[in-house]
Amino acid sequence: MAKKVVGEIKLQIPAGKANPSPPVGPALGQRGVNIMEFCKAFNERTKDMGSFNIPVIITVYQDKSFTFITKKPPVTDLIKKASGVEKGSDNPLKNKVAKLTHKQVEEIAQLKMEDLNTSTMEAAKKIVMGSARSMGVEIVD
C-alpha cells in the first residue's frame, strides 16, 4: 500500500548549502520532517552543482518521511552565468547588460530541456531567449 501524501513543499536552495535556518527549517518543521536528515541528503545530492540555486520539490508523507526531487538550476541563473552578469537590467527594453550567442542559448536549452514544458529544442530555445530578453540580455549570432 502506498504512503499517504500530506504535503508538497517547493523551495529553491543553494546547491550543497541546505541548513536548518529559514527558508528550509520553518518549511519542513511545520510538516514534522527531520530537517537535518533532509539537509544532509540534499547537500550530498547537490554538492557538485556549483553555486546555483536548485529548485527542489519535497513530498511529505503521513509517517513524517519524505522524498525529494531536484531540478536543474533556473534559466535566469544559467543565463547570468553564461553572460557573466550579476543581475538583469532594470529596464530591459533600453538597457542591455550583456550578450549571448545562439550556441550558448542552445547549451542552456539542452541543459533545461527535461524541466521545460516542451518537447522540441526550438521551443526550448525560444523559452530561453524570452527569459534572456526580459533580463536585458541581447541574443547575437
UniProtKB/Swiss-Prot annotation:
Transmembrane segments: none annotated. One or more lysine residues are methylated. InterPro entries: Ribosomal_uL11, Ribosomal_uL11_bac-typ, Ribosomal_uL11_C, Ribosomal_uL11_C_sf, Ribosomal_uL11_CS, Ribosomal_uL11_N, Ribosomal_uL11_N_sf. GO terms for biological process: translation. It comes from the Bacteria. GO terms for cellular component: cytosolic large ribosomal subunit. Keywords: Methylation, Ribonucleoprotein, Ribosomal protein, RNA-binding, rRNA-binding. The keyword Ribonucleoprotein applies. The keyword Ribosomal protein applies. GO terms for molecular function: large ribosomal subunit rRNA binding; structural constituent of ribosome. Coiled coil: none annotated. SMART domains: RL11 (SM00649). Part of the ribosomal stalk of the 50S ribosomal subunit. Interacts with L10 and the large rRNA to form the base of the stalk. L10 forms an elongated spine to which L12 dimers bind in a sequential fashion forming a multimeric L10(L12)X complex. PANTHER family: 60S RIBOSOMAL PROTEIN L12, LARGE RIBOSOMAL SUBUNIT PROTEIN UL11M. Belongs to the universal ribosomal protein uL11 family. Forms part of the ribosomal stalk which helps the ribosome interact with GTP-bound translation factors. HAMAP family: Ribosomal_uL11. This is Large ribosomal subunit protein uL11. The gene is rplK.
